Amino acid sequence: MNTSQTAAGNRITFTSQPLPNGTISIAGNPGAVISTAQLPNTTTIKTIQAGIGGQHQGLQQVHHVQQQQQSQQQQQQQQQTQSAGQPLLNSMLPAGVVVGMRQQAPSQQQQKNVPTNPLSRVVINSHMAGVRPQSPSITLSTLNTGQTPALLVKTDNGFQLLRVGTTTGPPTVTQTITNTSNNSNTTSTTNHPTTTQIRLQTVPAAASMTNTTATSNIIVNSVASSGYANSSQPPHLTQLNAQAPQLPQITQIQTIPAQQSQQQQVNNVSSAGGTATAVSSTTAATTTQQGNTKEKCRKFLANLIELSTREPKPVEKNVRTLIQELVNANVEPEEFCDRLERLLNASPQPCLIGFLKKSLPLLRQALYTKELVIEGIKPPPQHVLGLAGLSQQLPKIQAQIRPIGPSQTTTIGQTQVRMITPNALGTPRPTIGHTTISKQPPNIRLPTAPRLVNTGGIRTQIPSLQVPGQANIVQIRGPQHAQLQRTGSVQIRATTRPPNSVPTANKLTAVKVGQTQIKAITPSLHPPSLAAISGGPPPTPTLSVLSTLNSASTTTLPIPSLPTVHLPPEALRAREQMQNSLNHNSNHFDAKLVEIKAPSLHPPHMERINASLTPIGAKTMARPPPAINKAIGKKKRDAMEMDAKLNTSSGGAASAANSFFQQSSMSSMYGDDDINDVAAMGGVNLAEESQRILGCTENIGTQIRSCKDEVFLNLPSLQARIRAITSEAGLDEPSQDVAVLISHACQERLKNIVEKLAVIAEHRIDVIKLDPRYEPAKDVRGQIKFLEELDKAEQKRHEELEREMLLRAAKSRSRVEDPEQAKMKARAKEMQRAEMEELRQRDANLTALQAIGPRKKLKLDGETVSSGAGSSGGGVLSSSGSAPTTLRPRIKRVNLRDMLFYMEQEREFCRSSMLFKTYLK
């Protein structure tokens, strides 16, 4: 009998003596009280022993104790008290649980005097172990010696027999059991013959579906590498294979809530061997299930695309687009199902949404890694994958539990593990140092798509400057071609020619604008746009352009060159005179901000330009842009007209220059002017242009054969016939052009004959009765038909009178035997019999016709045309009096009568023998 003693500090020390067969005795000091408070849990003890090479070799030993504690029994046991000599336990074994162990039978090769290693003990925590008040020990009968060691557990469903294996180990080892429950109780057992590390995780019943426990433990399951063990574990715990250097025995105790105990237990009883084994391969099953799920989703989408190919093209395109949006996570599964039902007119599928939510992440990852391919569907982008794609890129690190000695303690909520990372050769190597894994909120940054930042050029505000009239300072911003390009601001200072300088006469000045390279690229706070230069009189084209750039960068951006402007000397001279008059009138400038819109490739923006405008005098006024002309009052319009007269009085060249620069303003101000005046200002001669347009008609008709000739007849046969005729007459063989001309003549002749026959056939099928221009003069057929109807009516009236007479004679009951009366009765009976026979025959015919089915009578084209035209013609004539539209058949049939009529009308055939032979047919 094994005894136990209670030491100070709530520690129970077990001796190293072996347990007797089938008996576990638990006794305690009367003065010691062991108290634990636990929620109803399901505790699983897993011990995985790795054998060590040497003289002592043993089998793997697996102990599974699965026990479910009921809250009602626990409360009843907590309320019971015991007498003196028995300790008080708040949590004890239920009444129906029996635990027994039996030592392994010695083999035949072993000697009997050699002592065998004792069976490893099963350590039960304080909230599980207890003693019933009346039964201090639990005893089982000894099992048969021929059987393997087993563990018998009694549950609510009956007894269960679990196999137990023994092993050997070094004699001097210390075992530490750390209880990380809410009570923080510690039980130590010394002098155990194996090296064992036990992690106990207690999950409260209230947090059954979450990974957060009361003590926030992180459990790392590890299996020794020297043996293979079958262990049953919940699906949310992952088992990793690690190589232990010393092959220790690792026992893991996991306490799971009572609500999940029924689903996590596996009870199998074998009738032949009497043993039950629990085998689980959660990782392989999960991988297979995920593969099947994403394959089903791929087949579903592929079949959907294949079915959409039978639909019209727009439907097929919409289905493909919808599936691509679903793969790219642009559409939720609910919206996908709704749109798919509307596209294909299908019935709703409520189970499809859940299936898509479960399988779409796996399918997206498989499409991204090219594991699966759907025809016509592109893989999703990387940012759609999220954590799924990140987990594939991160390296997988294996973890090994670091053994903890008796003197070492760990903080609640942390677990010390040793990380094994693969080296360059692929073999795992342990890293130096220790890693503490604690429960912290996840801090993972997902890779997101790069953002495009729209930066334009920084625009510097130029204040109004008081400068002489020879300069215009304008700020210009170049166009932006891409979102990532940065444009800079450019200052262009335009200097005008002095008033006293006069250009050389009879010369054209050519100025090229836009040959400037921008070297400053600075970020902008405004969207890029193009801006016009000024709203006043434009600068003279004979200016030298000077670009002043404020920058420190060396990047160059080319500006598209503008066309060369050519102006006559008279226009330049008039322009300078106008500038001089404006300079004498006023010595100050009014700076204005003009907002204009400039068309560009990008959306138009309102651009403000700080420009120096010309002074406004008493009699002169600058022309506003065309957009403002509509809102100008009458007085301002009169002033502008006076300004225009003053400008045009200086000469024809000055007016031409003004019209060149401000053509849009003048056109909007004066409305639709004479086109000749506008053309004359632009230097266009309308008479010359019209003569050129009319002169191109000379080339029409110069090339006769614009396309290749198509020969109607067979050219070799025709040439052979012509050769035979010319050889008989002793003539030379003609060229090929003669045969081509004969073929064209024959084609034209046949075309004329066919056209005439078509007209004759149309006249033949014409219905003259439907023509409103004709009136019937004689209708002999109608008259004969009317007389026939009169005769039929008279005959019917006589038959009715005779029938009535016969019926009256048949109904008479005179007793006088009259031979005439008898004949009339006989005739009446015969007539009735004939009527009955006729009715019976009619009924039989109707029945037979109904049995055969409806007869479809094919209507001829002529009948359809005549009947349709006749039925519609009466209504049309009666309502509107216009001619009805006669439906002509598209196919024209020409018969022999039409051919005879044609031959009678033609001069070549009217006296030919062919016509008379045709008469005889």
Curated annotation (Swiss-Prot):
InterPro entries linked to this entry: Histone-fold, TAF4, TAF4_C, TAFH/NHR1_dom_sf, TAFH_NHR1
Q: Does the keyword Transcription apply?
A: yes
Cellular component (GO) terms are: nucleus; transcription factor TFIID complex
Show the GO MF annotations: DNA binding; DNA-binding transcription factor binding; protein heterodimerization activity; TFIIA-class transcription factor complex binding
Q: Where is the TAFH domain?
A: 290-386
User: Disordered: where is this region?
Assistant: 66-85, 166-194, 423-442, 860-886
Alphabetized UniProt keyword annotations: Nucleus, Transcription, Transcription regulation
- Subunit structure, briefly? Belongs to the TFIID complex which is composed of TATA binding protein (Tbp) and a number of TBP-associated factors (TAFs). Interacts with TFIIA-L when in complex with Tbp. Interacts with Taf1, Taf5, Taf11 and Taf12.
Name the chain's protein. Transcription initiation factor TFIID subunit 4
Taxonomy of the source species: Eukaryota, Metazoa, Ecdysozoa, Arthropoda, Hexapoda
Gene for this chain: Taf4
